[in-house]
Regions:
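Phosphate-end processing signature that detects enzymes handling 5′-triphosphorylated RNA
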Residues: 1-166
Length: 166
């Protein structure tokens, strides 16, 4: 499956406000990046959502700064634990809270990192490269970081950028 997405740094939205939005959901995510060939990103994820836990393995090959070919499958907890021993050297498990909501029929994902107090990362998938992203009025975009390697999840597992440089 080809995924086209855009990524932005935003001011952290008011938690109570976004919880009241249509189709809001919240999940705790732990991502671990694994050793792989250089053109491939290989990760496993533990996602806690509504009293359940789902484990997935994802292999992603970047096509360009906006799109990637992605293969994802659900795995067992045992497989997750076994694969986690192959963590890529120089990386750390990445923890974040993901809040999702729908606005004008479009799914928005806001990733909140414990290391940042005032900002978060917003991602949205697009149907095409030229699709224009319409933000809700309560989202304040600081800057777009689509294609900026410092803000890829794989890079953030090595070093989360200082919020002051945002």
């Amino acid at each position: 499956m080809v995924e086209i997405e855009r990524k932005y740094i935003i001011m952290k939205p008011d938690a109570e406000f976004i919880k009241a939005l249509p189709e809001y959901s919240e999940s705790k995510i732990l991502q671990i990046y694994l050793n792989s060939e250089s053109s491939l990103t290989h990760r496993i994820r533990r996602r806690e959502f509504q009293n359940s836990v789902v484990y997935t393995e994802t292999k992603k090959r970047r096509i360009d700064k906006m799109s990637a070919e992605e293969l994802e499958r659900e795995i067992s907890e045992e497989e997750f634990n076994n694969l986690s021993s192959d963590i890529m050297r120089g990386t750390n498990p990445l923890n974040k809270m993901r809040c999702t909501f729908v606005y004008l029929g479009k799914l928005f994902e806001v990733d909140i990192y414990p290391e940042w107090k005032n900002t978060a990362i917003l991602e949205t998938e697009l149907a095409s490269r030229d699709e224009v992203v319409t933000f809700p009025e309560f989202i304040r975009v600081v800057k777009e970081v689509t294609g900026n390697p410092a803000y890829s999840n794989a890079s953030m597992s090595k070093k989360i950028p200082e919020e002051s440089t945002v």
